[in-house]
Amino acid sequence: MRARAVWLAAALICIPLALPLMGCSLFNKDDDYIPENPADSLYNQGLYLLNTKQDYKEAAKKFDEVDRENPYSEWARKALLMSAYAYYQADMYDDCVNSAKRYVTLHPGSPDAAYAQYLIGSSYYDQILDVSRDQARAEKAIDALQQVVRKYPSSEYAISAQKKIGMARDQMAGKEMDVGRFYLNKRDFIGAINRFKVVVTQFQTTRHVEEALMRLSECYIALGIIDEAQTAAAVLGHNFPDSAWYKDAYQLVKTAGGEPTTENKGSWISRAFQKMGLTTSQNG
């Protein structure tokens, strides 16, 4: 799952190592004042640690020092973004998020703001755990990455952000399926239906929706609600006719005496697919 984005970082690293120091006169009345640690020196030390030593944590510290000693300068702006990138490379995601958020807040109109926002989303995304764990970070990843797509649709990061959103949504749907199966095995059919319903209504574009529809047929049959069971099967068959899950749902409904191709258009299942612009069957 680890995807180390380096597009902007590569461009920043190519910045000449001896750019003139900027902005000192803005903060010091004495034109002869020489900072103990000049910004260009600190910045170049950070680049050396980042590129040559691959000591990302120490590199981030150098970039942070640039920001502290030369606030509001062009050096500070560049260093803040490089700090976020270095923290990301060091797997220090919370620090990366903090630096990247600060960059977006201070420099919302910068051409590099899209990358900073992308780093925020990627930091959350890289912390998504398996479906048996809480998915709070998946939600944060989706929110942050959606901001990339919404605010910077023409940026080079929008497509990658969209892909990660899809994978994060798939992860969240998988969590709902995991809990739903648990309830189903406990014969808590209402609890299971509520979980599978989340997948059908909120995560229809994920790979889990096929199984969710079949499981709904299974649960409704167990409760004796054949109308909903056959609607779930009909919607499944119409949208995924070659799915192995449809074959299972078809057989379940048939065995229960229902008609797996008959859809109740007033069912929440049918309405959920209509709302998303997805197709439903012509029967019902």
Describe each model-derived feature in a short phrase.
Residues A9-P20:
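Bacterial N-terminal signal peptides
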Residues R2-V6, P20-G284:
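Acidic, polar-rich low-complexity tracts and alpha-helical solenoid repeat scaffolds
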